[in-house]
Amino acid sequence: LVGSEMCIRDRVGMECAYAPFNWTQDTDTTPDGSKAVKIAGSDYYAYGYDVAVAQKLADQMGMDLEVHKVEWSSIGISLDAGDYDCIIAGMGKTKEREASYAFTEPYYYRNNCIVVKKGGKYSNVKGLSDLADTGCKVTTQLGTGWIPLLDQIKGAEQSGNFETTSECFLAISNGSADVCVIDVPTAESAALTNDDLQIIELDENDTFTGDDEMVNVCIATRKDDTALRDKIQDAMNAIGWNDKAKMDELMDQVLTQQPAAN
């Protein structure tokens, strides 16, 4: 959406490595016949919840979807540089991010959880207090709103955070971390192909506080590009993408479509 391209291309940035929100695959086909989207400048394709939503919105706006793959650590920098025009990447709308970007209303609502090793020392945890003073090694993804939550696990050892969620889950599998704080869909996606993982949704009366921001997953544009933000929001409204039942149905669908490698 740059200059004369405004009505032609919907240029979207995403990690393409954050299943089930977005991932990279070899072909444009999925098991249910949905079409993955070619990654700009690549021989690979992207699919997942973010891609499916982006395609719906591009269709509504009469635009061609163009997916740009970018490292999570530089996803905002590349938006500001003009490499693409919006971020649809499982991004939570936080107060800190709102200072830098314009956001739509949520296109997904997610719950947070912890992931531990199945059958391990922490597999019977029910609430946050069960982890207190155990000296558990905690981790999450870099550059996310989950990092501040780690400090709420009393006496935990900060074992280091990772660029991708895949690395977080590998740390749980190999024992270099005991607890990963993450969202439920991402954990469910990983558990489909990693039998070492156990997902625990903490008791609502014994869980993290101040994590509400990470529940709202929104589309970001550059701070001054409110016209594009509003155009995307209008498209969301037009297709009724404020219905949590629709969101959950699509998420359930894409969870079954990811290649085993993701």
Question: What residue ranges belong to the model's regions?
Answer:
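Bilobed "Venus flytrap"/periplasmic-binding protein-like clamshell domains
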Residues: 16-19, 43-60, 91, 110-169, ...
